[in-house]
Amino acid sequence: MTVGQALERAEELRPGSRISLRTRQQWLRELDGLLRLRFFARCDTKEFDHAGADRAWAEGLQDQDRLLVPEPFDGLYVHYLCARTDAALGETDRYAGEQAQYNGICAELAGWLRRSYPVRRAAQWRW
């Protein structure tokens, strides 16, 4: 999924949310940095080294920049953006639902990474 696709899908679900584009881009950067640290850094592969909003941020995040998480788990970006939007606007019930969906996809992603890639030496999975 690209930055533009994630932002567009989240905007469809939360139209007119009053959250600036720059803030939503910052959320994507923070999320990719967190996911890289918690999940992808433990995998002994270089496949994901150049993807992610955290890596593209220095050059200015563009709509066509590829996000870190591959299909079919990339739907987590939309749930994350919606959850952050709901939290920022005080929509706690909507936030809880979106966050639960995000957490479920994260758990599936962690399992897939453990099964698909060897663990780097001196790294431990804690999920």
Regions found by a protein language model. Name each.
Residues M1-R66, G104-W127:
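Conserved short "hinge" loops at termini or chain/domain junctions
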Residues G16-I19, A88-T92:
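Charged, low-complexity interaction regions
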Residues L35-R38, R84-L89:
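Generic structural signal for hydrophobic core residues of well-folded globular domains
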Residues R66-G75:
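Structural motif
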Residues G75-A87:
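Short, hydrophobic/amphipathic alpha-helical patches that form generic packing surfaces
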Residues G90-A100:
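Short conserved catalytic/interaction loops centered on acidic-Pro-aromatic/His motifs
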